Design a protein with these regions (language model features):
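Hydrophobic, membrane-embedded alpha-helices of multi-pass small-molecule transporters
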Residues: 2-21, 138-145, 199-286, 326-348, ...
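Hydrophobic transmembrane alpha-helices that form the core helical bundles
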Residues: 26, 46-54, 58-143, 148, ...
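C-terminal membrane-solvent junction of multi-pass transporters and transport-like membrane proteins
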Residues: 131-134, 163, 371-376, 417-474, ...
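Membrane-interface "cap" regions at the ends of multi-pass membrane proteins
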Residues: 1-35, 45-50, 194-200, 500-501
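TM-loop-TM module centered on a large, flexible mid-protein loop between adjacent transmembrane helices
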Residues: 67-74, 111-112, 199-218, 264-344, ...
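A generic transmembrane alpha-helix motif of multi-pass inner-membrane proteins
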Residues: 36, 168-171, 175-177, 182-183, ...
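Membrane-interface loop-to-helix entry segments
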Residues: 134-200, 240-243, 264-270, 406-419, ...
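Loop-to-transmembrane helix boundary motifs in multi-pass membrane proteins
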Residues: 1, 133-137, 252-274, 356-398, ...
């Protein structure tokens, strides 16, 4: 994998298609500003990203967070933190990637074709992809295809990643164009036409606006600084993954280069943050502030009139309504389909590398790290992770309470990022030889290593982000179930420390 491939890998991993911020934030946080919240999340992630740059150049090995933490804090801590927060919880991302593929990919494709071609049958097919078993079938096939691709050789994934990258960029660019070239007035008419062509009732836009007002939803709330600050943790669900390429550092050419890692990690963060903020600005420009809160109410408050055929009004659906063209629908959908497929691939790539590193340190069974003589890939690790994902996919789609914890993965993975940032801060003191031989050792502020400064700031910022999820109900993780899951994760962590090194 070249540095450029790693750079686009991180952008795809952060997910240009991730939709939650655009509906969750206006629904749960009236008065918050989407664009500023996303930009704040990007700024807050910078010190964490920089800590990963220093760690990656000091330890350019596959295994990422586990390697960083275990070499600074010891194998027991590294194993328990990364196993509980990453290896186990990223199984949730396997389920999420299937949801993204089925709901935002295939469902949007057929809903869009139904609306632009005036074919209610296609619309009905699209609705099926939003049902639990529709999503389950797509999710398992998605995970299986990713496993087969990766087992065939990492180079095959890298080649296909370029297809996913350019398709996603084209899709994203088209959406920006459609939104920036529209006005709320033209949007209202085109949305109404789109819904009628799909077999729906006329005047969808006006009906939704009136229903929101009838439900006492403020469609033009005053600016709220607190709400804007709370948008940042939602956007962080995407931007926190800027450093994910570190899991396969050993397979990135020039991974020890400080400049390369700055581009791969920090560069991908800034590009993704700016693109997501641009989409937020374009989205609100096209549909208007009033309808933004209607769409948010459909997602957060369950406003029935704020949905289209029971489907939330995601940016890609509304872009298709604006386009009115089956060709544009296919192009936008293809980007979403391929970026969703990339998500499950990165789950396997990152976690199999972590599992192999743990196995080589004798913290997982030896068979986990066996590499196929013919395929030159860790087949056993891939197969184990695929099988482990199936029950998670089933629970995610069949148990509504678990679905409510969709982004609980942000909390669990968040504490991994915090501990890794601390590992960066303490590396000059607890792993002196490693740090002294690294390119980053030359950068100091006075006598204080810069990685210590960035690592401490990053750990503090990450801690604040995680605590916001725990204490603000608008972020969705204050239920009894959420605390039970968090407690179980902590018990798993504590159990892991007792494993022999």
């Amino acid at each position: 994998m070249s540095p450029y491939s790693a750079f686009i890998y991180n952008i795809l991993t952060m997910g240009l298609i991730f939709p939650w911020t655009y509906l969750w934030a206006p629904g749960a946080l009236p008065g918050g500003r989407l664009v500023w919240g996303i930009l704040l999340a990007m700024i807050f992630e910078i010190p964490i990203a920089l800590a990963y740059v220093w760690l990656s150049t000091a330890l350019p090995r596959s295994g990422g967070d586990y390697v960083f933490q275990s070499r600074v804090f010891g194998g027991g801590i590294g194993f328990s933190i990364v196993m509980s927060g990453f290896v186990i919880w990223i199984l949730q991302w396997v389920a999420l990637s299937g949801w993204l593929l089925s709901y935002l990919g295939f469902a949007s494709l057929f809903l869009g074709l139904g609306g632009t071609m005036g074919n209610p049958t296609l619309t009905s097919i699209g609705v099926w992809f939003t049902t639990p078993w529709g999503i389950i079938i797509v999710s398992i096939l998605n995970a299986l295809l990713a496993m087969l691709l990766l087992v065939s050789g990492f180079k095959n994934y890298v080649k296909f990643q370029y297809v996913m990258w350019y398709a996603t960029l084209l899709s994203f660019g088209l959406m920006l164009y459609l939104f920036f070239s529209a006005t709320p007035e033209t949007f209202a008419q085109k949305l109404n036409d789109f819904v009628v062509a799909s077999g729906g009732a006329p005047n969808f836009y006006e009906t939704a606006i009136n229903a929101a007002k009838g439900a006492n939803i403020d469609l033009n709330p005053p600016f709220s600084l607190l709400a804007t600050l709370l948008v940042a943790p939602i956007a962080w669900t995407s931007l926190q993954w800027a450093s994910y390429s570190a899991q396969q550092n050993g397979e990135i050419k020039g991974a020890r280069s400080f400049q390369n890692q700055l581009v791969i990690i920090l560069g991908s963060l800034i590009v993704t943050g700016l693109l997501l903020a641009a989409l937020a600005a374009a989205f609100e420009h096209a549909i208007g502030t009033n309808f933004l809160y209607v769409a948010g109410a459909g997602y957060w408050a369950g406003l029935a009139e704020g949905k289209f055929n029971g489907v939330f009004l995601w940016p890609n659906i509304l872009a298709m309504a604006l386009a009115g063209s089956p060709i544009i629908v296919v192009i936008i959908s293809l980007g979403y389909i391929l970026n969703a497929f990339q998500i499950v691939n990165n789950c396997y790539i990152g976690m199999t590398r972590v599992m192999v590193a743990m196995s080589l340190d004798r913290l997982l069974p030896e068979w986990v790290s066996r590499v196929s003589d013919r395929l030159h890939t860790p087949v056993n690790a891939h197969l184990a992770y695929f099988l482990a994902s199936i029950p998670v996919i089933l629970v995610y789609n069949l148990w509504g309470q678990w679905t409510a914890l969709t982004l609980g993965v942000t909390f669990a993975c968040g504490y991994v990022f915090i501990v890794t940032a601390l590992a960066g801060a303490l590396m000059p003191y607890r792993a002196k030889a490693l740090y002294g031989a690294s390119p980053g050792a030359a950068y100091k502020v006075g006598s204080i290593p810069m990685v210590t400064i960035f690592g401490l700031i990053g750990a503090l910022v990450g801690g604040v982000m995680v605590l916001m999820f725990m204490f603000y109900s608008a972020l969705g993780l204050t239920s009894v179930l959420a605390y039970q899951v968090g407690s179980a994760s902590w018990r798993c962590r504590s159990f892991g420390i007792s494993w022999p090194e």
